[in-house]
Amino acid sequence: MTLTRAIGKSAAWVVGIVAVLIAAAGVFLFTFDWNRAKPWVNEQVSAALGRPFAINGDLKVGWRRPDGETGWRAWVPWPSFSATQLEIGNPDWAKTPKFVTLDAAHFDLAILPLLAHEIVIPSIDVVNPAVDLERLADGRNTWTFQFKQSSQPSPWKVRLDSFGFAKGTVTYRDAITKADLTVAIDTLGQPIPLGDVLKEQEQTSREASAQRVGKRGAAQLSAKANAEAASSASAAQAASAAASSGASAATSMASAATGTAGSSASSVASASTAAGASGASGASSAAVPAKPSGPTYAFGLKVDGRYKNVPINGTGKLGGVLAIQDTSRPFPLQADVKAGDTRLAIVGTLTDPMHLAAIDLRMWLQGTSMSHLYQLTGITLPDTPPYATEGRLIGNFKRKASTFRYENFNGRVGGSDLGGTLAYEQREPRPKLSGELVSNLLQFSDLAPVIGADTAASKAKRGDTTRQPPDRVLPVETFRTDRWRALDADVKFTGRKLVKSSNLPITNLYTHIVMQDGVLSLEPLQFGVAGGTLATTAHLDGSGAPLKGRFTVAARHLKLKQLFPTQKVMQSALGEINGDASLSATGNSPAALAATSTGEVKALVTDGRISRLLMEAAGLNVANVVYEKLFGNNDVKINCAAIDFVATNGMLDPKVFALDTDDALINVDGPINLRDESLDLKIHPHTKGFRIFSLRSPLYAKGTFKNPKVGVDAGALALRAGAMIGLGLINPFAALIPLIAPSNNRDVPCSELFGQINAKAAQKAAAKAGK
């Protein structure tokens, strides 16, 4: 009995002591001034981060009952930690001393999961977080921490169930990309479905497109995008109907299991766009569409600053912080940003945002000129008129091997449509751009900026500072060959119809553009025009300075009647133009290439009619004045015109330059200087038999392309004004023989012209031999 009593008393003492200890611990925990522990906490966290850490305000610890727990677990309280004025320091080399500052932070910690080596934070809230990110030119950055390394993986796991904050800012400075950005972030108040954001962005972006390419162009762009989206939606509905009937049950179950159904941002985009298109066309349905149950946005942001020295400002939206941790769900993002004169908008999803796995976005792009994208992206594109595009951007991120596809996009460039797919591949030593582009209706004027031949107003609009000299015709704007070495390209382009004027359509334009290590080639560049074909090749080597170029042109069966459809005088013409050119040159602009060109240019024109009005319509100032001097206002039938110029370092010398009419045989001699765009030509008319011809003295054409001067050379009669071109040659037309019947084996009415000049050449050769 004594032993039992002793044991009982001992047990009572033990229980009492434990109770006292628990009570004392409780009193200690609830009454302890945790600010005394701040030095120890600061020291431990600083050591773990490898950066200075400090709690400059109060540190408090409280206790509360857990949420969502039942049974005895509901009686195990959670510690609740609060701190104010927290900061993490930056490395010594950083421009600012603080990496992160928080006005306040509060989080709970679940106790029981600690027994299983799991840190569960039911909720964390921060107030006014500010993050400062910086990267130097040598690659050092402030967001890389030097944590203690361990050869063994940590047995601990971390889980965050809820995260909230009010108003945060992120500053980003990058010496490599020349970025200096400030991003303000805040909660949206309530989640916004991706589909709702898509519809809003679609309307906003199409209004922006109208500002660039006009309301009509934007409407055509929208109609085409809506039609394709409706087609995609119809295909999706058909597939869904087949699946619901049981034909594809297994596939549907597999898709559901892998989470592919509804995970694509483009699927949401297509469905939304199709709905808009259906509504616009007046279609109605009794069923009320269900609210999208896909990804939602939780945060809004505003960005301002500079990127690659280009001014940046815009807005955006992001998914919740917890969604970042879930690799099985797409993370939504949206942005509408203006960079200089370029505007970019995206709506879609990011897969595994912690590791930047992939993107699937709807993208809108508008700008003054596509060449301006080079500064932002490093992608070399030509100068263009204002443009707007809309399409799907998909991409996969890999270290130094990322790939992106702008898929099935539609666009407007000036007054032309443009569509297709472009792929960008990150690789060494240079990235590569490839794809196929198609234009159903291409305006000829929209091609002028590509070679710098657009108007001064157009150049000013796209920001080109090159001034075309007032006395020069050939474009002096230089090729940006330094950009050619930044990117390789393999792009095929088809223009189904190219319009210079409504009466002269060019059809079936096709070119294959290849750029490799600064060497650009268009082989071939061909199209149909005026019932014939024009085939060219261009090879531009920009790998060194100056640029080296090689060009060939072959014109076949260009019908005069179709070439000048608005000129009545030509409607009775049955002839055509055939020609060839082969030139090589060096220079960094079209004018410089012309000034150094070497090669040959030859052409035959047969069975045509010309008038002074035709010369004016063609913009041939010199020819117009010469025509008036020779023929007055009369229409003239051209039996044959033959041209064969030899180019030597920018000097064009005519081997043959002759014109055969019913009344006269006219030949031209003298050089054309492409270096200074000057002329020194003499035009010699020779009457046929006793036919009356008003002018028997030769004419001269001097001056420049821009300011030509034409007059009568009264010092010599036509019959004594030097022999016809080629009289010292055995057969000056030998080089033109291939053009007489290029492919159709029809006779060309040039026999009289050829015969007369060849006869005179033979007479002169015989006279020389007899001396």
Regions found by a protein language model. Give the residues of each.
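Terminal hydrophobic membrane-targeting helix
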Residues: 22-138, 395, 700
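Solvent-exposed beta-strand/coil patches in large extracellular/periplasmic or lumenal scaffold regions
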Residues: 146-175, 197-203, 207-211, 215, ...
